């Protein structure tokens, strides 16, 4: 996906790329849901909102980073999401800080810094921070997915509401920014 976003970023904004990616996925998952006669009703709409919001922000930031930074750099920054997820589960789910986990999280971030130091130029610092934030928000989104699963939400419903949120969010964002025909 990263390669296609990088290529598409020459012609489309991040909001447009998120919108079109999500719209296609929304249509497909909606058709599957309807063909199988599944229900979209959920008692966990608030949690779906937070999962959609965090995933949308992560996707927007990731697509922006892909448009500005070298492909490998943007992907490396986004791939910090498991490190953030490990931190979130320790704090938010009260899984307790284990010394080995803390050490591996620090080691993981040190590795990211080591990998990026020679490739991230001063003028790319803001884009780099936004790319890192994409990993942060993706970690939150993954935590939300774990919580939704614990609430008994099926995967297809989680995917539907996420793509719906991203389609709406990307569409609204496009209204306030440049649009490419």
Language-model-detected regions and their locations in the chain:
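Hydrophobic/small/kink-forming positions within alpha-helical transmembrane segments
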Residues: 3, 30, 52-60, 82-87, ...
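Transmembrane alpha-helical segments that form core, pore/gating elements
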Residues: 3-6, 29, 121-178
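Structural motif at transmembrane-helix junctions in multi-pass transporters
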Residues: 10-16, 61-78, 154
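Alpha-helical transmembrane segments of compact multi-pass small-molecule transporters, enriched
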Residues: 24-28, 77-91, 106-107, 165-169
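Loop-to-transmembrane-helix transition segments
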Residues: 34-61, 126-134, 181
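C-terminal transmembrane-helix exit sites in multi-pass transporters
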Residues: 37, 64, 81-103
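Hydrophobic alpha-helical transmembrane segments in multi-pass integral membrane proteins
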Residues: 60-68, 113-120, 166-181
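Hydrophobic transmembrane alpha-helices of multi-pass small-molecule transport proteins
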Residues: 100-117
């Amino acid at each position: 996906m990263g390669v296609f976003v990088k290529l598409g970023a020459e012609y489309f904004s991040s909001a447009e790329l998120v919108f079109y990616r999500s719209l296609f996925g929304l249509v497909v998952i909606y058709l599957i849901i309807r063909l199988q006669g599944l229900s979209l009703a959920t008692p966990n709409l608030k949690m779906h909102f937070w999962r959609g919001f965090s995933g949308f922000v992560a996707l927007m930031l990731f697509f922006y980073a892909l448009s500005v930074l070298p492909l490998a750099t943007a992907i490396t920054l986004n791939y910090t999401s498991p490190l953030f997820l490990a931190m979130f589960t320790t704090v938010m789910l009260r899984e307790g800080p284990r010394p080995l986990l803390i050490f591996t999280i620090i080691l993981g971030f040190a590795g990211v810094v080591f990998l990026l130091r020679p490739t991230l130029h001063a003028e790319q610092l803001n884009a780099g921070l936004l790319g890192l934030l994409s990993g942060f928000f993706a970690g939150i989104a993954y935590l939300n997915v774990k919580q939704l699963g614990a609430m008994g939400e099926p995967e297809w419903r989680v995917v539907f509401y996420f793509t719906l949120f991203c389609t709406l969010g990307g569409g609204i964002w496009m209204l306030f920014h440049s649009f490419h025909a």
